[in-house]
Structure formats: structure tokens, C-alpha cells
Amino acid sequence: MLIWAHGLWGSPNGSKVTAVRESGIEVLSPDFNDMELNERIDILNELVSKQEVVLAGSSYGGLACAFVAQQQPEQIKGMLLLAPALHLPESPNENPEKLVAPDNFPISIIHSVTDEIVPISASKDYVERSENNLKLIEVEDSHVLENSFSLIISE
């Protein structure tokens, strides 16, 4: 099961998750609109605790996924982060430099080098801190990654 966490301006039926669904991948995408980070993490933790999953998160949703993966690594089979907002010092991520990736499952990050919303340095710092086998794919696109749908689906 793929659990999709959309970003602040996204929705459970946004363009990226719709493209993934249309490719034939089964996706569960909760509605996180108007929710703080803690609320998103609570919902994801509950879903993840029920079965092994693959997590995918975009921007703010990527931050929530990274946090849940750190809390429940044994339940995660893989994770895809899209322009993740890993640098935001927001509760419970008051110290972003302490957020590290688990090393027991594959993780891919797709981030645009020209992202004007979340700097690519957020992803690069996460990769460097984590000291494990993360795959950072740098693309030329916007924060929304609208030109990278085929890459998102393949990852």
C-alpha cells in the first residue's frame, strides 16, 4: 500500500497523486488540509501502525513522512519524498538537524534545483546527516514538480 501525504497547498486528489493512481498504483491519500504537522504525523502513524507501507510525501507532507519513518522504521518498506520541507523548525521538528533517515528501507528524494519554495539544500542536508543509502534525484522543475510525473511514478 502506498500512503500519499500531500503538501500545504495540495489535496488528496492533486495532480501528482492522480498521476500515480492513473498509473495503476493503489494509493491511500488522507485529506490533510488545514492540519498542523503534529496532526498529520498522528494520522500517518496510525495508518502505518496497521500494515507495512510505502510512504510518499510532497513538501510539507514529505516532512511528515520523514518524521513518521524515523518513528516507525520497521513498518516502512520504502519512501519517496518530493521537494520535502525538511528544514522547517516546527513542532515536533524543532531541531531539523536531528531528523535523519532510517537505513532499513530504500528512500528516494526528487527535488528541483530551481525550487523557490523549499531550497534543495533541505534535501541535501538530510542526505548528508543520514549517512545511509538515500537516492537524491535533482531535476530542473518547479516546486510542484509538474514536469517530473513520469519520474515520480517510476520511483
Each language-model region and where it sits:
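Active-site catalytic motif of lipid deacylating hydrolases and related acyltransferases
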Residues: M1-Q51
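Active-site nucleophile loop of the alpha/beta-hydrolase fold
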Residues: G7, P30-N33, L80-L88, D141
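Acidic catalytic loop of the alpha/beta-hydrolase fold
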Residues: S11, H87-L88, T114-V118, H143-V144
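Short alpha-helix in the alpha/beta-hydrolase fold that links the catalytic acid
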Residues: K16-V17, E94, P119-E128
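Conserved alpha/beta-hydrolase fold motif
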Residues: V54-A56, M79
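Gly/Ala-rich beta-loop-alpha elbow adjacent to hydrolase catalytic centers
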Residues: A56-A66
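Short beta-strand/loop motif that positions the catalytic acidic residue
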Residues: P102-D103, S108-H111, D115
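Post-His helix in hydrolase/transferase enzymes
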Residues: S142, E146-E155
